[in-house]
Amino acid sequence: MVAKLTEQERVEKLQPLLDAGWCLVEGRDAIYKEFLFKDFNQAFSFMTGVALLAEKMNHHPEWFNVYNKLQVTLSTHDVGGLSSQDIRMATYLETQAKLLH
């Protein structure tokens, strides 16, 4: 079963994501990042790849897309905050975004 990140895990695992441009969401235990792509096709292709992992993980991001902009919020609803699944998903998004740029 997935558990909410401990304080130690938050310190160790969140910092690399914060350094990469993710930010903590005010008022809730979640992280957020906005990704910009060349065009809609590139954004949609990125989202499709993320969707495949999300299905395998049974962990789905909250996201909003307009043309080449994708806004992503991650939090684990079952635990009421950030979990290792959010760290894994955010790390995957970072890796995939770097491949496109």
Curated annotation (Swiss-Prot):
Biological process according to GO: tetrahydrobiopterin biosynthetic process
Enzyme class: lyase
Catalytic activity of the protein: (4aS,6R)-4a-hydroxy-L-erythro-5,6,7,8-tetrahydrobiopterin = (6R)-L-erythro-6,7-dihydrobiopterin + H2O
Pfam families: Pterin_4a
Keyword set includes Lyase: yes
Catalytic activity, EC: 4.2.1.96
GO function term, MF aspect, one: 4-alpha-hydroxytetrahydrobiopterin dehydratase activity
Keyword terms: Lyase
CDD domains from the UniProt entry: PCD_DCoH_subfamily_b
Family: Belongs to the pterin-4-alpha-carbinolamine dehydratase family.
HAMAP family named in the record: Pterin_4_alpha (MF_00434)
PANTHER family per record: PTERIN-4-ALPHA-CARBINOLAMINE DEHYDRATASE
The name this protein goes by in its record: Pterin-4-alpha-carbinolamine dehydratase
Protein's gene: Pcd
